Structures are given as C-alpha cells and as structure tokens.
Design a protein with these regions (language model features):
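Conserved activation segment of eukaryotic-like protein kinases, specifically the C-terminal portion
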Residues: 197-214
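Short beta-strand micro-motifs within the conserved protein kinase catalytic domain, predominantly
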Residues: 72-91
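Conserved short submotifs of the Hanks-type protein kinase catalytic core
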Residues: 88-104, 108, 112
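Protein kinase glycine-rich loop
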Residues: 13-19, 24
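Protein kinase catalytic-loop region centered on the HRD/HxD motif
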Residues: 148-158
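Activation segment signature within eukaryotic-like protein kinase domains
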Residues: 142-143
Length: 341
C-alpha cells in the first residue's frame, strides 16, 4: 500500500512479459476507502536489483504522460518484504503501469493475433489482412499512430531509444501504443547523471533499428533524430515486409554505420522519400521533428507526393504536388487519474 492505494498481483498467473529488468504480472489497484472497485494494472517486479537497474526502473515509472498512443505509467513502489527462504526483510521494487490487452506489432507481423491467455485481438487480425492487400494504407495507419505517440514523448522532453515492433502494442480497444521506457531518457540529462546509466550498458535498443550514433556509443549525440532513424527503419519494414539489413549483429551494425538503406525497394514514392529522409546517416539531414514527419505522412495519405527536402530533413512544406491517390513516485496522482476515466 502506498499513498492510500492498495495493489496486489498473483505470481502464479501467466506473466505479461519478462525482460532484463524484471517480470511483469497482471495486477489490481484499489483505493483503500473502496476495495470493491479496482482498476487492472500491470506490475513489474524488478528482479535485477543492481543500482543502475533500480534507477532505470524509477526513471521509467516517472514518465507519466497521458496520450492514447503511449503506455501510461502510474508509479514506482519500494517495499520491504520477507525473503521466501530466509524470512529476512529485504527491499523489493515495483513499477506499476497500464495493463494492455493486446499483442505486439512484432507478433502481428508474424501472424499471431492471440494474447498469452488465448484472447483474440481482432484489430491485429484486421491490420494483418490490410497488410496483405494494401501495403500503403497498412503502413500509413500504423505509422500515423506511432508517430503521434513519439511526437508527444518528444514534446515532453524524452527520447525513447528502443523503438521497434516488440515495443509497440496493438490492443483490443483498437489502439496502437508505444511501450517499454526502460532506456528512455530526458534529452536534458544527456550530459548529466543519466548519461552514466547509458554508459553502463553495451548496445542500447535492437541492432536492427539502431541509429548510427546509438551503435557508436555516441551518447552526447543521442537526440530526437535518433528516434527518427528507428521510425524510418520501422516504416521500411512495414511497407516492404522485411528489414533493410539482414545477417548477424556485426554485419547489421556495419550496414547501419556505413551502408545505405535500399529505399528503392519501396514502390510508393511518397513513403520512399519519407524513409530516405528519416534514415540519413547525418543527424542534421534527418527530420528534426517527428511532427513534420507525421505531416509528410498525412499529406502522402491524402494523395500528395513529397518532393526532395531541403537537405536538412525539415520536410517539404510548400512543395506538395497533387497526384492520383494510390490506393511510485507520483503513484497516487497517476492512479487517481486512472480511476476518473
């Protein structure tokens, strides 16, 4: 119990997920003055209790942004509990977040539409069918939602640094949400204490979607364009149906650092030009704003074609031409808001 909020979870239940930081279980949160009403939540038990992992968990829990395309975080809970074997009181740490009923974008792309508990996600099936018949609109629908979420995250001062299909959820409620803020960081802290958390790791994010500055360990140059690069690779995969670079991690890293994304594989000229701008090696030549990238995608969706940009990745405002359309800490506040929904 913390800040008049009571929570519980069942360790015998099927975990919602598991990673290097901990195990996520389905849970419930109650008001202490009304235990008959509760909201379903996901509770991450932090099993890696190294100090840097605890600090990352606290940072992740603090990213409490209310947006339909972002996972809602409710707070961080430190608690003293008896060890199951020695019965000695030891600290345990939890991150409380929104419980999503859905499947990852990665699963959907592989033709998996059921959750671990056997629940069928109809929206994921619809998107998959759309991808089989209309790759352009499939790409636009998914990327529009993702770009809106990332744009909000950026406006709040954070970069995600791990954008890939496994960290995007498609829900029963027909929402597409970005999840997992484990390596998300405030841009303002790049040269501060948070940089040490970054330096303690090896490679941030998935190699398949990693920008050159991520792979080079160039922490001081991690910024909003780092996410833009990953979004470009993701857009490529959605349209083409495959990643631009394949092979072992070493060869993929070399390709991201010095190779060219084969954008010619994208048959739609508008989508192709957006991807080309997003994945440029030089950061100042990429889109400098996800909002502008979204504007370009919206224009393409509306039957307009984006022309070559100004070389700074700032979009093509004024250059659109018509074409034929082709087909916790802060736990109480977070939970209180959730109860009001």
């Amino acid at each position: 119990m913390q800040n008049q909020i009571y929570y519980d979870y069942d360790t015998d239940s099927i975990p919602l997920g598991q990673g290097g930081m901990g195990i996520v279980y389905p849970g419930r949160c109650f008001r202490t003055d009304n235990e008959t009403e509760y909201i379903p939540v996901a509770i991450k038990l932090v099993t890696n209790t190294a100090q840097d992992m605890i600090e990352r968990a606290m940072r992740e829990a603090s990213i409490q942004i209310d947006h339909p395309n972002l996972l809602r975080m409710y707070g961080f809970i430190p608690n003293m509990e008896p060890d199951p074997f020695t019965h000695e009181m030891k600290p345990r740490y939890y991150v409380v977040m929104e419980n999503l009923d859905g499947v990852s974008l990665e699963s959907m792309l592989e033709g998996v539409f059921c959750t671990k508990t056997g629940s069928d996600i109809g929206y994921a099936r619809e998107l998959y069918d759309m991808g089989c018949n209309d790759r352009r609109n499939f790409t636009v629908e998914i990327m529009s939602a993702i770009l809106k979420g990332v744009a909000c995250l950026h406006r709040s001062g954070y970069i995600h640094r791990d954008l890939d299909p496994s960290n995007i959820m498609i829900t029963r409620d027909r929402e597409i949400k970005i999840i997992d803020y484990g390596v998300c960081k405030p841009v303002a802290s790049i040269n501060g204490a948070d940089a040490k958390l970054t330096m303690s790791g090896s490679i941030i994010g998935k190699v398949d979607y990693a920008a050159p500055e991520l792979l080079a360990g160039d922490v001081q140059h991690h910024n909003f364009t780092t996410d833009v690069y990953a979004l470009g690779i993701l857009m490529y995969r959605l349209f083409v149906g495959a990643l631009p670079f394949e092979g072992d991690n070493s060869s993929i890293m070399k390709a991201h650092l010095s190779g060219e994304v084969p954008a010619g594989n994208i048959s739609d000229p508008g989508i192709r030009r957006i991807v080309e701008k997003a994945v440029r090696k030089q950061q100042d030549e990429r889109y400098q704003s996800v909002d502008v990238m979204l504007e370009d995608l919206s224009a393409v969706s509306g039957g307009l074609a984006v022309q070559d940009s100004d070389g700074k990745g700032n979009g093509a405002h004024g250059t659109w031409v018509p074409v034929l359309a082709a087909t916790v800490t802060g736990l109480a506040a977070g939970i209180a808001t959730a109860f009001m929904i």
